[in-house]
Curated annotation (Swiss-Prot):
Record-listed E.C. numbers: 6.5.1.2
Name of the gene this protein is made from: ligA
Protein name (database record): DNA ligase
SUPFAM superfamilies to which the protein is assigned, alphabetical: BRCT domain, DNA ligase/mRNA capping enzyme, catalytic domain, Nucleic acid-binding proteins, RuvA domain 2-like
SMART domains named among the record's database cross-references: BRCT (SM00292), HhH1 (SM00278), LIGANc (SM00532)
Cofactor names: Mg(2+); Mn(2+)
A GO CC term attached to the entry: cytosol
Function in brief: DNA ligase that catalyzes the formation of phosphodiester linkages between 5'-phosphoryl and 3'-hydroxyl groups in double-stranded DNA using NAD as a coenzyme and as the energy source for the reaction. It is essential for DNA replication and repair of damaged DNA.
Leading EC class: ligase
Gene Ontology MF: a single term: DNA ligase (NAD+) activity
Tagged with keyword DNA repair: yes
Family statement drawn from the similarity comment of this UniProt entry: Belongs to the NAD-dependent DNA ligase family. LigA subfamily.
Length: 682
């Protein structure tokens, strides 16, 4: 009987060739999901995957448990089997202050001779997900379980097999007989937002936060559902290990070894020695928190030396050699006192929760957005409820849950207005949209005010001498009705306003005069066309080059512009069909607003064409906005963070962590002068 590796079918395809195809797909998955550096386009990966599926369909006897096709998922389960952890998955003690961190360091002095303040620690972000155990037997994923109570968890093997960045087979020649990888499964913020958006479109229940979404996804009885969820694993340690080869002697080196055999490990892990470096890591990660792209709730600090870890040992539920230094709480409970309804620039009616003030994530919160009527219904919230407030980074505080058992008897239902609270025009909700809108248009004072505030904002016309309070006064006295009226103001008129002296009035007029010289992209953005943001305005300017061409563009021509679909194209067409809008634009131009028409840049052979670029540091010859606009004219994607997908980093003066990360990843770094030279600008 021939060996399995020598078997072949009637077409001449051998098992060895099939296995080579699997190995190629595993390599592509590793580079795509772990290194974030795809080797081939998605279409090529899909073609090879289909080829493998067809071959395995013809030869079911050739299917192996570690085949990439086996991620698709098994049949739905009736329930989860229990798994006993050979080595308990203990939790960590927490520290919430520098003093508590000092206490952690002091406690170690009783168990080791070394000074804890001179020890090396492996420092990791504390990921906000679900702890899991993944067992590899002879290099093949064999079993996965949740942490559960630390002793017993649930068997989630079928679901873990669907997580794209978890290898089904280790990337090594002589794998351990048994290797238990421990890590955190979480959902990146972008994936979470997309998941909730799709749920809303389907009228399904949304998740309150990424952690709940990750946990709910892993505990699906149908693995095919889990497969559709954007889950990610980051390993943080090793449990069971059986092999003739010894593991590295430090925790940091063990994580690097895991990474080398295909197990994903977080990129922010660092070594630190002593109290000051530990605190510096904490501060650094806290500062990065809003831009990481995934939720963390603190740092995890572990003694790096494995021998010292063993000396320090454990207390009843946690190791003595590690601690979680947590950030200030991002969720707190408070009472919903009332709901007010605000009217935005486009007429959107937004319910705003008025809360009993509560301290959350370092600030006192008394207001929180409720988004729209659907969100109120989803939460099942009423006035008087005790609610859970969440504030993450710079995100506007939001209500994520209701404590039903605390609902008072006098709780009051929230009534969504049928008439605008400002102008009393009818409020309507367009089919397919979650937002209700005032139909008053610019008849509505709230919409006029917000439109003017948008027009003068920094990224629009950048009239820094005209702020929100001045706009309110100008509108109250009916001195300004449209943006064009700003350019008709006189010194004597401004002098009659409250807290407006001669110098302040002149500064405002100087800012207004300066704003007349702008760019086509800024002007388009300032007009406040619904869904035309900075990037879309820049794309329109780059595509059509002048305002007349944009005004004359048809629905079909507009859709030829990058990122302009049917909805946005329709809104642009409708904007120019409204006589009032045309009058305002012509009035603005008659007041002297001007710009240079966009010159089509020859980018056929330019190295910047279509690249992903990050700006960092202080630029001296261009403003940040000018540099961004210049890059976009070359079709560049301007990103805020460095990754392996970044093509160029443009580094100005005092470039910091982004420069270091770019150098670490081998990203091409340009000085400001080199960047300008590439663009051909003088």
């Amino acid at each position: 009987m021939p060996l399995l590796s020598q078997m072949q079918d009637q077409s001449g395809t051998t098992f060895a060739q099939l296995e080579a195809l699997r190995q190629k797909l595993r390599e592509y998955e590793y580079y795509y999901h772990v290194l974030d550096n795809p080797l081939v386009p998605d279409a090529e990966y899909d073609r090879l995957m289909n080829e493998l599926k067809n071959l395995e369909w013809q030869h079911p006897e050739w299917i192996t448990a570690d085949s990439p096709t086996q991620r698709v998922g098994a049949k739905p389960l009736d329930g989860f089997a229990q798994v006993t952890h050979e080595i308990p998955m203990l939790s960590l003690d927490n520290a919430f202050s520098d003093e508590e961190l000092d206490g952690f360091l002091r406690r170690m002095e009783s168990y080791i001779t070394e000074d804890p303040h001179t020890l090396a620690f492996c420092c990791e972000p504390k990921l906000d997900g679900l702890a899991v155990s993944i067992l590899y037997v002879d290099g093949v994923l064999s079993q996965a379980a949740t942490r559960g109570d630390g002793t017993t968890g649930e068997d989630i093997t079928s679901n873990i097999r669907t997580v794209r960045n978890i290898p089904l087979k280790l990337n090594m020649d002589n794998p351990p007989a048994r290797l238990e990888v421990r890590g955190e499964v979480f959902m990146p913020q972008k994936g979470f937002e997309t998941l909730n958006e799709r749920a809303l479109e389907k009228g399904e229940k949304t998740f309150a936060n990424p952690r709940n979404a990750a946990a709910g996804s892993l505990r699906q009885l149908d693995p095919k559902i889990t497969r559709q969820r954007p889950l990610v694993l980051n390993a943080y340690g090793i449990g069971v290990y059986e092999s003739d080869d010894e593991l590295p002697a430090t925790h940091f080196e063990r994580l690097q070894w895991l990474k080398s055999i295909g197990i994903p490990v977080n990129n922010e892990i660092r070594l630190a020695t002593g109290r000051e470096q530990l605190l510096a890591f904490y501060a650094d990660i806290q500062a990065k928190r809003p831009t990481l792209g995934y939720d963390i709730d603190g740092t995890v600090l572990k003694v790096n030396d494995i021998g010292l870890q063993e000396q320090l040992g454990f207390i009843s539920r946690s190791p003595r050699w590690a601690i979680a230094y947590k950030f200030p709480a991002q969720e707190e409970m408070t009472v919903l006192n009332d709901v007010e309804f605000q009217v935005g620039r486009t007429g959107a009616i937004t319910p705003v929760a008025k809360l009993e003030p509560v301290f959350v994530a370092g600030v006192t919160v008394s207001n929180a957005t409720l988004h729209n009527g659907d969100e109120i219904e989803r939460l099942g919230i009423v006035i008087g409820d005790t609610v859970i407030i969440r504030r993450a980074g710079d995100v506007i505080p939001q209500i994520v849950g209701v404590v039903m058992e605390r609902r008072p008897e006098n709780a009051k239902k929230i009534e969504f207005p049928t008439a605008c609270p400002v102008c009393e025009s009818a409020v309507v909700r367009v089919e397919g949209e979650a937002v209700a809108r005032c139909t008053g248009g610019l008849f509505c004072g709230a919409q006029r005010k917000e439109a003017l505030k948008h027009f003068v904002s920094r990224k629009a016309m950048d009239i820094d001498g005209v702020g929100e309070k001045l706009i309110e006064q100008l509108m109250e006295r009916e001195l300004v009705h449209t943006p064009a009226d700003l350019f008709k103001l006189e010194h004597t008129t401004l002098m009659r306003l409250e807290r407006m002296g001669g110098k302040s009035a002149q500064n405002a007029l100087n800012s207004i005069e300066k704003a007349k010289n702008t760019t086509l992209a800024r002007f388009l953005f300032a007009l406040g066309i619904r869904d035309v943001g900075e990037a879309t305005a820049q794309n329109l300017a780059n595509h059509f080059h002048n305002l007349d061409a944009i005004r004359a563009a048809t629905f079909e021509q507009l859709q030829e512009v990058q990122d302009v679909g049917e909805v946005v194209a329709n809104r642009i067409v409708r904007f120019w069909q409204e006589p009032h809008n045309v009058t305002v634009v012509e009035d603005l131009i008659s007041q002297g607003i001007h710009w240079q028409d966009v010159v089509q840049v020859e980018i056929a052979d330019n190295p910047l064409k279509g690249k992903s670029v990050v700006l960092t540091g202080t630029l001296t010859q261009l403003t940040r906005d000018q540099a961004k606009a210049l890059l976009q004219s070359f079709g560049c994607k301007v990103s805020g963070s460095v990754s392996s997908k970044t093509d160029y980093l443009i580094a100005g003066e005092k470039a910091g962590s982004k420069l270091a990360k770019a150098q670490e990843l081998g990203v091409k770094v340009l000085t400001e002068q080199e960047f300008i030279a590439l663009t051909g600008e003088n």
